């Protein structure tokens, strides 16, 4: 069984949906909005979302364990049988790959995807992506925040990500450029589906949805978030 440690006393999670052109949900991203440490009266939170850098490594792993144990408690009718993506950085990857119980548990969950952080260690070395390949044997592997960090066309050519998410700031940078559609279609040629983050207006939504197999995620749908506390 997965050991749920006592580093974190309370978590508030949010599932943020991404939407396809027909208005249906493509997937949910599992976000940590705030936490309460043991023997601490204040929540660690801010308006734009929780930052893992404020936690120790043990606390980060505890939050991750709470995330995966929470998924099986979610209301399936609200999820509409769509996948839930978990954010995975180098620390969490190491936790998954070196804990048999966690690995076996995740492998048996049919609705989980790994959303790989843009600073993942294997992107820096451009090696044979051994860890990513091992992760992909457990759950589908997606790339988060393309256009920032260590992401590049070289990276997505080296590993077959099922889905690629476009970084919010990168989207806002290129949305008005004539090359926008070329960039999105180029990225899409390397995967099955693209999700553009940071969509806040109807105009942006329409532009993204004009690209085939491209979904939107952002503040435009804040009322559709699914919150859960443990």
Give the predicted meaning of each segment.
Residues 1-26, 30-40, 115-122, 146-153, ...:
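EAL-family c-di-GMP phosphodiesterase catalytic domain
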Residues 1-107:
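Bacterial c-di-GMP phosphodiesterase EAL domain
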Residues 64-67, 128, 180, 184:
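Aromatic/hydrophobic pocket-lining residues that form the small-molecule binding cavity
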Residues 69-76, 103, 130-134, 185-189, ...:
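Surface-exposed alpha-helical segments enriched in charged/polar residues
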Residues 71-72, 92-105, 123-133, 150-163:
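Distinct, well-ordered alpha-helical segments
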Residues 79-84, 108-112, 137-140, 162, ...:
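Short, well-ordered coil/turn segments that N-cap beta-strands
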Residues 82-84, 88, 100-103, 112-113, ...:
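Compact, aliphatic and Gly/Pro-tolerant "microcore" segments centered on a short helix or tight beta-hairpin
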Residues 128-144, 188-196:
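Short beta-strand/loop segments at the ligand-binding rim of alpha/beta enzyme cores
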């Amino acid at each position: 069984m997965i050991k749920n440690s006592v580093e974190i006393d309370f978590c508030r999670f949010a599932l943020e949906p991404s939407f396809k052109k027909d208005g249906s949900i493509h997937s949910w991203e599992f976000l940590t909005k705030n936490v309460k440490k043991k023997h601490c009266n204040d929540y660690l939170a801010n308006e734009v979302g929780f930052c893992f850098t404020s936690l120790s490594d043990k606390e980060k792993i505890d939050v991750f364990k709470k995330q995966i144990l929470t998924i099986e408690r979610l209301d399936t009718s609200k999820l509409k049988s769509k996948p839930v993506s978990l954010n995975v950085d180098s620390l969490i990857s190491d936790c998954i790959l070196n804990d048999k119980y966690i690995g076996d548990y995740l492998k048996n969950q049919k609705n989980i995807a790994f959303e790989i952080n843009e600073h993942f260690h294997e992107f820096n070395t451009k090696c044979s992506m051994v860890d990513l390949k091992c992760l992909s044997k457990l759950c589908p592997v997606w790339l988060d925040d393309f256009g920032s960090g260590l992401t590049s066309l070289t990276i997505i050519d080296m590993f077959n990500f099922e889905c690629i998410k476009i970084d919010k700031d990168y989207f806002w940078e290129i949305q008005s450029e004539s090359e926008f559609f070329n960039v999105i279609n180029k990225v899409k040629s390397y995967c099955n589906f693209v999700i553009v983050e940071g969509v806040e207006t109807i105009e942006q939504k329409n532009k993204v949805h004009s690209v085939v197999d491209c979904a939107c995620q952002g503040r435009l749908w804040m009322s559709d978030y699914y919150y859960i506390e443990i």
